[in-house]
Every structure is written in structure tokens, then in C-alpha cells.
Amino acid sequence: MKNCLGIELGNYRIKIAYMEKNVLAEYFSERIENGEKPDHRLIAQTVRELLAEKNVRCKKAVFVLKQEDSYVKRVHMPLMTVDQLKLNLPYEFHDYTGDRSADYRYDYALIDRDEKEMDLLAAACRKDLCEEIAEIAKLAKLKIAGIVPAAVGLERILERAEGGEKDREKKDFAVLDLRNRAVMIHFFRKGIYDMTRNMEPGCSEIELLVGKNKEKLTEFGLDADE
């Protein structure tokens, strides 16, 4: 896709990136006040207004799932057919989905394979969330080109930063993701997503700590006079 939108519907902000002829042409966002989750029509209206304001007419969109809205893991499985993989993939996420595995959609990307084993990057996302995104896209008059986890989006950015050369040796990366309520570190092994680790506090709490907010300092067991 030479021209495409990338849209992330966050808890506090709607973010939109526009790629034109494989080059980032626009990036803009709109804050959602108080972190409230508005209804689908309001989200769609906000997206349409942002696109109109920037005079962006592209209708193809890839929606990016927030880290907490999907499960992504690298798995090694015995070599099997596509039908067998569809049957077995949900079991790889049983620790996360429990008895609700039927409520999720699953997908994968083949990293490597040999005569006995497959190396996969697998993902799971709630069906109802996919349906919500489809409804918002329809209301915003956009065509869904894909729904991808945030980690996969970061993987593509790293690949592009490396020059996108297939024969070039891939490096290990750690991406620091600064958020309001938490700090996340995403690890990539040889350019491929591996895992995410969460740390607290987030940026909003760090700001309070730096400002010597007594209540927050007490919460973290710190002395305001030090």
C-alpha cells in the first residue's frame, strides 16, 4: 500500500499517521478529555474532522491496537498445515484467555521454518474489539486495510530505520514507551518482537514526584524534605 492511514484509538488520545507513496506525510492527534471513552459516533466524527482539517483524503486505514488490547508472543510449533495451525493456535494463548478462547481472534506471521518446526509471531485480540473498530471505520467512511498490535507497528518502524535490507544482519532493540500511567519497555530480538515489560510509575506520577507532591511521595515511601 503506497498510501495508507495508521490510526490508534487510545484512552487519552486519537493518533493518526498518513503515509503517502511510502513516506510519512502527516502525523496529528487529538486529546480525549479526562480519558473518557466516547461513543463510536463521536470517535468516528473526530477522525473525520481531523482528516478534513489536514486535507487528507485517503480511505485505507490500518488500526493499531493498544498494548493492553492484544496478546502477542513468539512461539515455536511443530510443522503443520494452516488448518491444523488454526485449531492449535488458541492453546498457545490459554494462559491469557482461559475459558474465553472462543471470544478471541487469532493471527500469525511465519518468521522461519524447517522440516520439523515453525517459528511464528502470533497474536490474539478480542472479537468484540475488532467489531468495534469495524463499526468506527464504517462510521468514519474508512476501509480497514488491517488491524495490528502496537508491537508489530514498532517492528515495522525498526525495520524501516534499519534500511529494510533483507540480507542485512538484524540487531536487538529495546524501545522505551513513556505513558501517563506506566512505562513500558518493548524488546526485539534480531528485529522481531520478543516481549514487553511494564514499570511503574508512569509519566504523570513521575511529574508529581519531581514536583514534590506530598501525597504521591508518601505513596512511594519517599520523604518530601529530602
Task: Name each model feature, range by range.
Residues E132-I133, E205-L209:
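Hydrophobic side chains in well-ordered alpha-helices
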Residues R57-K59, K143:
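Short loop/turn motifs at secondary-structure junctions
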Residues L65-G163:
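Active-site neighborhood for divalent-cation/phosphate handling
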Residues K54, T97-R100, L158-A161, V210-L217:
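Conserved NTP-handling cores and scaffolds of large molecular machines
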Residues K143-I147, Y193-M195, T218-L222:
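Short, structured loop/turn "capping" segments at alpha-beta junctions
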Residues A25-E53, E207-V210, K214-E226:
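N-terminal phosphate-binding loop and adjacent alpha-helix
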Residues M1-E30, A61-K66, R160-E205:
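Gly/Thr-rich phosphate-binding beta-strand-loop-beta motif of the actin/hexokinase/Hsp70
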Residues A44-N55, L158-K171:
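Phosphate-interacting basic helix/loop segments used at nucleotide- and nucleic-acid interfaces
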